[in-house]
Amino acid sequence: MKNSNRLILFTLLLFLGGIAKAATDVDTLQTCLDMKGKVPPEQALECYNQKAQELLTKKHPRSFRIARDRGIAEEWAPSDEPVRVYKQNYFLVYSHSSQPNNAPTSPNPNNQVPYTYALDKNEVKFQISLKAHLLGEDKHALWFGYTQLSLWQAYDNAHSNPFRENDYEPELIYSYRPDNLALAGATASFLNAGLVHQSNGQSLPKSRNWNRFYIQAGMERDFGDNGKLALQPRWWKITGGDAVDDDNPDIAHYLGHGEFEARYYYGQGALSAIARIHSLQLDLALPAPRMLGMLIQNANFHLQYFNGYGETLMDYNQRHRTYGFGISMPFE
């Protein structure tokens, strides 16, 4: 792919949010136009007035402070929205690795990937994560979640800019939200139980996958003007697999049996950390420059740092450091 093609693709990604928003605005006003001649003029005028107020509100992206007023418990509250944000959604236009995994290995001899060429240390990294409400109301709800992490060798023109890894992660989640349960100075927000499958969708020898059952708790503490802290520890049990067919039989040694996620919101910024037994990922989201905010509603400038094992499934037993920057969308 030529440099110009990459520029076009990235430009389309930037404008996608603005185009979608403009289409929604047109549909909104069309509702009022369709009322012409069917209702009294006063009622049609009131429709325009109401829709105008809604559109003006959309012109000013909500800040992290506004979004966080609801608390993380509301992230698991059933609503009329067919699709909701799940984990962090970001697009890093530049991600640099200290040590690319040129020949991925595994204790399973069927999963030894031979060396072909040296990967580019610079690439594009992005994650899409959404969830949908299936059943239940109020305190008890069943959700379907989907997360995809992709690493794209967009700057490697010599090898046709391949995607070196795509990790697909569907899951089924039961969520319980207690009523204002205080715990060690914080508020217990939710208790989730889930079944998750993660795979890179590759055939042998590049195939990597694992299945888990997990329990996750969410708690939050509001410090008023000093921000808000959300803690989300998760423990998992690896299921399935055997010594013969398991693509990555020693994955627990590198990724452990759980992770600890912390998010701190202050003003219009957010810092999040995900820690496992042998890895740490830090994400910092800050208000985007005005021009970018006009193109993509609610977009943030995003910085990311990763150190350890398991940035992707293919790299589950490869230790390296990466850092990158790009844009992200806020948590709900």
Predicted regions and their residues:
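Outer-membrane beta-barrel initiation region
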Residues: 33, 38, 42-158, 167-170
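Glycine/small-residue-rich hydrophobic helix-like segments
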Residues: 270-299
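A cross-kingdom marker for long, charged
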Residues: 55, 302-304, 308-313, 324-331
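Outer-membrane beta-barrel "beta-signal"
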Residues: 169, 282-286, 320-332
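N-terminal signal peptide c-region/cleavage motif recognized by signal peptidases
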Residues: 17-20
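Bacterial N-terminal signal peptides that target proteins for export
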Residues: 2-8
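Outer-membrane pore/translocation modules
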Residues: 99-113, 120, 135-267, 275-277, ...
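Cleaved targeting-peptide boundary
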Residues: 22-29
